Amino acid sequence: TGITPVGKVAWEQGLPTASYKESRVNGQQAKQLTLNADTVLRTGLMDGLELQLGWAGPTWTQVKHTGQTHEEDGLGDVSIALKKAIDLNDDKLSMAVMAEAILATGDDGFTVDDDIYSVGSTVDYQYNDLVNTSITMRYEVQDGNWAVTAVPTLGYKIVGKLSGFSELVYRKAESQNYQYQLGSGLIYAL
């Protein structure tokens, strides 16, 4: 829920995120492993409002199906977002809302195919100077189909301007199975 101060830039570089999915293709089991590392640049536009520019980054995928292994790699989509802090008049509890557009600019096989527009909110609780927890709820639409995502996160300070996060991503889209992902990353404030 933190907002980058006006005139400052924060660079969020995600550590490689792994996702694993099993499915059935033509009655045969298929296993897919994906590794991805994303980047977000944040800058303050005015007090309590920031601009975020993101890139889904490089991605590697391995699919095992009918005894064969197929690997691919490519570059992901870009995103633009505005995030607004909501003043709750509380020293430990904070909230922010965000509107985002993910633009389908990535390589074939590594893009969302159609642009995604979303709104979301995050509530964060700061336990102490070193640890915080948060929950993010996001509602999105892509080509007329809706989805909801919930992301509980644990944040921790490492040293100086370096901090980290670990998160569980739960997503449910129309006519799709539930999706789960684990992620972690580092944040270095410039």
Roles of regions detected by a PLM:
Residues 1-190:
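Transmembrane beta-barrel domains of Gram-negative outer membranes and organellar outer membranes
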